[in-house]
Regions:
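OB-fold and OB-like single-stranded nucleic-acid-recognition modules
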Residues: 15-160
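N-terminal export signals
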Residues: 1-17
Length: 160
């Protein structure tokens, strides 16, 4: 399905509720907004040898097709809340180390995920598939601001 959403295709809500639509990270950006228009030139933090991106108003623009959609997408876990059983909320990020070892991607490239079934803490470096209902919701966390929220119903290790 990746690419079809980016091209602006619309899907009937009834179809979204029956089967998860597999999406990729580029599908989070609304049609007609190139990624290059989200991230500005940024600045170099010479002291820490780190490039700090600058985002414009496009960084919070979300894909309207995804609001309320039942989706499946891959990503990496940045834990926010944990219990003795595992991670109960996290930021789903497009690459390992996002928000921790590198500056965070723009809000429309980050998903705040909650799950009723905790994800084991020993699998945090593995890519995962997350399936559930996606929504538009700006959430500020200690690691980054997210543009999407996802109520996870299913999670599994992403097999490369």
């Amino acid at each position: 399905m990746a690419g079809a959403l980016a091209a602006g295709a619309t899907l009937p809500r009834t179809a979204l509720a029956r089967q998860a639509i597999e999406i990729m990270w580029e599908d989070l950006i609304p049609p007609g907004v190139p990624y290059s228009e989200i991230i500005g030139e940024g600045v170099m933090d010479e002291r820490n040898d780190l490039w700090l991106p600058e985002f414009d108003e496009n960084a919070k623009k979300l894909n309207p097709v995804l609001d309320g959609a039942y989706i499946k997408m891959p990503g990496f876990i940045i834990p926010i809340e944990t219990s003795t059983e595992g991670v109960t909320s996290f930021v789903l990020v497009p690459y390992v180390g996002a928000c921790i070892h590198t500056p965070p991607p723009p809000p429309n490239q980050l998903v705040f995920v909650t799950t009723a079934t905790p994800w084991p803490g020993d699998d945090l470096w593995e890519a995962v598939w997350v399936t559930g209902k996606m929504g538009h919701e700006i959430t500020s966390t200690e690691v980054a601001e997210t543009g999407y929220a996802l109520a996870a119903e299913e999670m599994e290790i992403y097999i490369w």
